[in-house]
């Protein structure tokens, strides 16, 4: 009498995943542009924040200088000196003097991290100081 086979005998089992070789490299190549885009957006956001902060620093230094009678004409140079080099080169200063106050508005052009795009607008900050 023949005994029932519990297991079927076959040759070696085919290798599972043999056709999946290199799939992770293809997936990585597909996601890489998205990762680069997110990284560039984060860097651009940091540049915007830095430009705004530098505009405020330049405005305060320029207003402080313009508030003194003897150094009033040097306000733009002192404002640029308080800023980093690359933001100082992109900065414009506007002075509006009232009776007892001096107000300086600094405008900085925000650069783009994408080559050839130009600028992404401007960041402006103002500072008011009492006259001495």
Where are these regions (language model features)?
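Alpha-helical assembly-interface signal, strongest on the long, hydrophobic N-terminal helix that forms
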Residues: 1-75
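Short, conserved structural patches
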Residues: 2-9, 68, 72-132
């Amino acid at each position: 009498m023949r005994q029932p086979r519990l297991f079927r005998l076959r040759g070696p089992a085919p290798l599972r995943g043999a056709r999946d070789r290199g799939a992770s490299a293809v997936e990585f190549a597909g996601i890489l542009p998205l990762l680069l885009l997110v990284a560039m957006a984060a860097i651009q956001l940091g540049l915007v924040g830095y430009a705004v902060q530098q505009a405020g620093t330049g405005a305060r230094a320029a207003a402080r200088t313009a508030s003194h009678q003897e150094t009033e004409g040097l306000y733009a140079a002192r404002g640029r000196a308080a800023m980093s080099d690359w933001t100082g080169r992109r900065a414009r200063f506007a002075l509006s003097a009232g009776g007892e106050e001096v107000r300086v508005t600094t405008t900085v052009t925000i650069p783009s991290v994408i080559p050839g795009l130009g600028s992404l607008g401007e960041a402006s900050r103002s500072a008011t100081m009492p006259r001495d």
